[in-house]
């Protein structure tokens, strides 16, 4: 960790310049602990994704690392594998601290760490708001080697001296742009002040606005910078279609017709507002479709139940807002429907990058009114992709 103020002006707005281009194209050649390697393969990974090929080794070597990459590229596994490689399972106490912007994402990261570290005898605790403080304190006192959490609760636990940082080796900020844009700047700066000077810092972010760059300049020492460009992100394997809908109010019938045509194993339907999510859920339920809904207004416990039902397959269709696009990671989703096109093009990949990550096939269907055509063209241009009119035989493709 470092404190300096130079170097900020060198970086073009919104994007970092890579200063590292070594690629390691297999997990076997990363010299990982055998029990970690076993966990990686057991989790279902075969070969590293673009970001994993570039970022895992410099992190393991102890460099501060800034990685710019979108969701759906394998970021979580990148820092999970790196942290697990550097941990000493025999030492109790937090050795890797991971911050995430939302509770969902923190819990998802915890699941990945636990799954990949399955053969390593390590503990990972999710330290998040909306849970019982006493239970949190009890879990932390047992000395889990990895703690993943949201900034407010983590800061609180460090200040109470329940989350000890004496053994801390690595501090990881995931989706840094999201954390700062949600107003966690002060907590994050406070956490930095409470950590040992020698802590290695790893920062991951989809975009690089000024406030993220300031964090990197203030708190990172000669960081390795890795940019995974858009074209390395995968819309590959995802068939993208649009259905032209003349009027907004006809979308509901269009969706019902689609339901009739297609056997949906699992689908996520995205709307742009919480109100629309509730409205659509009511309408579909009234038409005897079984759907669940999830948005930011809901209590945490309620969201957990919905997510659990969806992951286990007992609920087949989830209607959600963009807020949760980054926190939903359901491997078996075969279909994503954009009932509303996203309000900004960056969110398009967060939404549909779900359906076919890492070569899993998926289908995305966009409902497009006359007002949406321009946005759809922008999305096509931005991702150098084609969104074609939905064919009659769409059922065969899903």
From Swiss-Prot:
Residue ranges of the motif Q motif: 25-53
Compartments, record wording: Cytoplasm
Sorted UniProt keywords: ATP-binding, Cytoplasm, Helicase, Hydrolase, Initiation factor, Nucleotide-binding, Protein biosynthesis, RNA-binding
Catalysed reaction equations from the record: ATP + H2O = ADP + phosphate + H(+)
Domain Helicase ATP-binding as annotated: residue spans: 56-226
GO cellular component labels: cytoplasm
Entry EC no(s): 3.6.4.13
Source species, domain of life: Eukaryota
Residues annotated for ATP binding in this entry: 69-76
Name of the featured protein: ATP-dependent RNA helicase eIF4A
Organism: Neosartorya fischeri (strain ATCC 1020 / DSM 3700 / CBS 544.65 / FGSC A1164 / JCM 1740 / NRRL 181 / WB 181) (Aspergillus fischerianus)
